[in-house]
Amino acid sequence: MNSFPKIDVLAACAKYGPVLKVPTGLDGERIMASLASNESSTGNDCGPRHEPAYDVGGSVWASSPAQRALVAQYGRLGASSFGPWQLMLINYPGFSPAELEINLDDCARGCVSHFNSYVAHFEPKNLVEIGQIWNLGHKTVNPPAGVIRYCSDLQKAYDSAVKQPTSGVS
């Protein structure tokens, strides 16, 4: 299991969070920190975490030639998520599992890139919709129980997130 110090994850949120394309009234730094809280206990459990839907026989694997190629190239790691934001390799062409596993800055930039291209595409109106998109891949009026719990935990993490001082963050 890989991990990053919480203070470093929060510093990355302070550095990159302000460029997240978020709904009016929400704070990108706090959203980024909340996602890291939900996905990895803010860097404590960064995986890699196997995601069966992305592996041989899974729904994503079955429907995606690109995902099948990643599994063929990297085996189980091609179907795993990495880092404080649990990034799936398929969403980061050109990155290897090792790069997402050991480089916090690459992970943070990857989080912002995925958020601003994929999540923002769905035009979420609130934190619940952001949670649904990040966890489920889309918005829905009838989310499964696990997604409801994920969004509730995301809201709690957001409500308790404190913006980090910007001094000393490069």
Which ranges hold each PLM region?
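Catalytic glycan-binding domains that act on GlcNAc-containing polysaccharides
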Residues: N2-V169
